[in-house]
Amino acid sequence: MFTSQDARDSRPDRELRMMNDVLMTYPYTVIHLPAQNMLSTAKGMVNIAENYRDYPILAIFYVKYLMKKLPYGVIPVNLEWPEPYVVLNTILKRLKEHKFFANKDKEDFAERLHKLIAPDVSIPESRKDEILGQQKKERVVTKTINENFLDPVNARPRLQRFFEKLHNGTLVENLEVGLCKVEILVSSKAMLGQSFKLQIMAANVRELWVGEMVCNMITNETDYGFDEGGGDDDEGSSVEVQNSQSASPGQDQEAQRAPEAPETSSQLFDKIVSALQDDPDSAKAQLGQCRKLASYLLSHKREQEDFFMQTKDTRARLYLDLKGCLGSSWKFSIYRGVRCKQNGQLKVSLKPSNSGHLSGFWVNIKMTSQGNTLDDIRLQVRCDILGKDTNRRGGSEKDPEDQSETESSG
């Protein structure tokens, strides 16, 4: 008879789970085709560089790293590959920093892994700390520009003129080297007025925050517990606890006797969105409910697919809302996706077309309220204007906030 102990023994041991985490085995699927010296991914085929031919684990890891970093981007067939030791360093660093090694010999394990996946790759002594995504030497900030567009009087034409100068390069003239940091604050209420459009935009922000948060939880199952400072389960269930405490003893006994009807994904989603609408500051308290929804969708694949598609549609609607507020006649595209913060804010990456001197935009979306009533949706737009010399050498597409803030990507 299959006992509970047999079930425990049949589970992957902690070492295997750790290796799955370190090598990002899930959720990214990359297949090695040794005969063609290529990798097959959901985003197409990728040629493996010659110096990676004998190290397919390194090649697979690098492509998975790019898939995680650029979830909505395109991975070209002919990639620009870093030195193999950089990828190896990254893997070994992830291994050593894994929570599994709280009281274990991580150096010995790292040495064994090195010999297993890349025995002939040597790491130069001066390059032992060089890893993927490492922040390059910061460019000198030679100028900063801050503008607010909060007054509804002439807000739209003022913003339009500002963007025109930003786009054609006349906002900052004679910037030869370094960069200019630009930050503007836009009031959606000033752009849209106290109209139905503002309410629709607020609904899209709430729905997209829930959608992105749940999709991130589903995609990153290993991060399900929010180890990095997220709200805990007690916090997430605080609304239900308060309701239970306020019920009378008779109601409480009746509730215990009555069978609880299972909630569907749409019911759970609507409950979270309604809670955010009733209390705009309750985002962190809803993380527990988001986990509950993610757990449900993990066991209902068809509904999970529909949920991902619904979130994609909401993302497209919010993009139209942003264009309506920013009022720019030049084209944007969502570049590096959307990040959701646990406090309910969203960050959207936008890339303007035909603007090589701009590094791209990050728009931080924050709803403000008076009591429980929506007051405004503030858009904090940040970008870097690259100096002419910097632009010729190729500008960075990183988040302008990354110099002062470390944040998870979802």
Curated annotation (Swiss-Prot):
Keyword Disulfide bond: no
Cystines in this chain: none
Compositionally biased residues, Basic and acidic residues: 388-398
Extent of Acidic residues compositional bias: 225-237, 399-410
Keywords on record: Plasmid, Plasmid partition
Record GO biological process: plasmid partitioning
Location of region: Disordered: 225-264, 388-410
Biased composition (Polar residues): 239-253
Pfam families: Rep_4
Role played: Plasmid partition require REP1, REP2, and a cis-acting DNA sequence (known as STB). REP1 may act by intercalating in the yeast nuclear matrix and binding STB either directly or via REP2.
Protein name as catalogued: Trans-acting factor B
Source organism of the structure: Zygosaccharomyces rouxii
